[in-house]
Amino acid sequence: MIKTFTIILAIFCLLPYAGKAQEVEKSQMLDKGQLSQAFELQKENDSLYWLVATGGDKVNGWRLAYPVYQFQTGDVNGDGSQDMMVGVIKKTRFYPMGKRLFIFKQIDGTNKKGEVCKKVRPMWLGSKLGGILEDFRFLAPAEGDSMGRIRALESTTDSLYVVSDYKWSGFGMKFDHHIIKGVDKETATKYLNQ
């Protein structure tokens, strides 16, 4: 049963984006010489989105069958290419708090017809950062650093809030440092947005 579900899920997720979504939530464009990277988060309904890599004649999407609460772009891993950070609401068996951070990249590939196209592929489908994720934002690399950071607003089990920075560690996000901890949500939100 699990193997069948995994195979069906993998096949379904790899299908090229075939339909038009009802609305485009947000998009970001980056010009890199002759390569143009564009990303769109397209909403079909409250719990079905498509993360679409455009920038060419052919496009390919990644199906997100979860409500989305946040969408950001930036160079997470320092490779010079834009990545996509998507906040989804998805509970897991061992971690029922619903908000997650998924990170995607854009690659060149071919579709079933052998045509060159832009594809969306996951870099990290995280179940947890540190605390209970409430929100996040991408911070561009600091001077002298090649990697950006993800600043996360997290709640704690004692109803307080923490704002922390995370950096890419080769596979996934690694805690870097706290900005502030043990504060109310309003104070933490101010630090998240600094």
Write out the residue ranges for each language-model feature.
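Sec-dependent N-terminal signal peptides
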Residues: 4-15
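Beta-propeller-forming repeat regions
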Residues: 19-194
